[in-house]
């Protein structure tokens, strides 16, 4: 793996440093760009990356690029300080432009990343294929456990209302992070649950400042993939879960019908953490999708 910093242009010709991790064969014929979810960073998708790359005896002809979203992980906030969906779309388009991958380009988004990717592709991001994992198929407040989303809205509103020091501390409160983690994990494997909680403890609070989190959260609950689906002509793979508390499975089927060319694959026994709990079947669906014949 190669750890790299890219200088990406933003509003007013200002530039921002985006940290990304470059896996696999740099000369591969296919480049897969990953966009992680809200409050995470590139670590969240590493199990899927490992499954996709294979082992040394059977390496995949694949390059995988996993940036940290601006303001999260190792990436600096966006220039201008506005972390709206439109700003993240502009950033992704510029990041791909700077990356300048050769050959086939595939862009994958998980959770909030699915909204960013869908909006960017609908806005003209040039990519051959699209993959959305745990896509936000409908407004978050309408999900099976919309009450939890409303509690999250109150939590972030409270964090924004407090003095900066106390608001920042509330956002990083380990007990609240643990509650979020417990509510999302569906596995009954005690060891896997501990590992998931550890990942959230380590990476869920690595953000630049309070404003970044507040603005990104507002973007994540104000939009969903269904707004952009009809404008995405590229072959699209949707990987959904039957126990996702944020988007019910029925909404995923409706979402599929909005795309001109989408395939829906459902993984059972998992919720919004496919990337942690079911990386093997997710990677298998991705490999199958990437191997499909495409019209010339």
Residue ranges of model-derived segments:
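Catalytic histidine-centered segment of alpha/beta-hydrolase-like enzymes
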Residues: 270-283
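Conserved alpha/beta-hydrolase "acid-adjacent" motif
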Residues: 245-251
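Flexible "cap/lid" loop of the alpha/beta hydrolase fold
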Residues: 130-165
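Short glycine-enriched nucleophile-adjacent loop
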Residues: 114-125, 130
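Conserved HGGG/HGGXW glycine-rich cap/lid loop of the alpha/beta-hydrolase fold
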Residues: 22-74
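Conserved alpha/beta-hydrolase catalytic His-Asp/Glu region
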Residues: 166-231
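Short beta-strand/loop motif that positions the catalytic acidic residue
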Residues: 232, 238-240, 244
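Active-site loop/oxyanion-hole signature of alpha/beta-hydrolase fold enzymes
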Residues: 11-16, 21, 63-112, 122-123, ...
């Amino acid at each position: 793996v190669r750890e790299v910093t890219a200088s990406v242009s933003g509003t007013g010709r200002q530039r921002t440093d985006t940290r990304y991790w470059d896996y696999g064969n740099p000369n591969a014929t296919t480049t897969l760009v990953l966009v992680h979810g809200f409050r995470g960073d590139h670590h969240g998708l590493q199990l899927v990356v490992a499954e996709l790359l294979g082992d040394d005896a059977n390496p995949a002809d694949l390059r995988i690029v996993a940036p940290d979203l601006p303001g999260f992980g190792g990436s600096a906030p966006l220039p201008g300080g506005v972390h709206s969906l439109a700003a993240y779309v502009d950033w992704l388009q510029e990041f791909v432009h700077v990356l300048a991958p050769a050959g086939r380009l595939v862009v994958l988004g998980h959770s909030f990343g699915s909204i960013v990717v869908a909006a960017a592709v609908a806005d003209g991001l040039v990519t051959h294929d699209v993959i959305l994992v745990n896509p936000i198929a409908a407004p978050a407040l309408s999900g099976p456990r919309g009450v939890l989303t409303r509690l999250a809205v109150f939590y972030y509103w409270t964090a924004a209302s407090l003095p900066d020091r106390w608001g920042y501390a509330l956002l990083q409160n380990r007990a609240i992070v643990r509650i979020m983690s417990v509510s999302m994990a569906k596995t009954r494997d005690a060891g896997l649950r501990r590992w998931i909680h550890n990942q959230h403890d380590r990476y869920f609070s690595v953000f630049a400042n309070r404003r970044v989190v507040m603005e990104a959260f507002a973007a994540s609950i104000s939009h969903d993939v269904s707004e952009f689906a009809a404008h995405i002509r590229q072959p699209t793979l949707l990987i959904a879960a039957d126990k996702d508390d944020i988007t019910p499975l029925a909404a995923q089927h409706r979402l599929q019908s909005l795309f001109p060319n989408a395939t829906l694959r459902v993984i059972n026994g998992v919720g919004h953490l496919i990337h942690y709990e079911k990386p093997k079947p997710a990677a298998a669906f991705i490999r199958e999708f990437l191997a499909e014949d495409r019209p010339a």
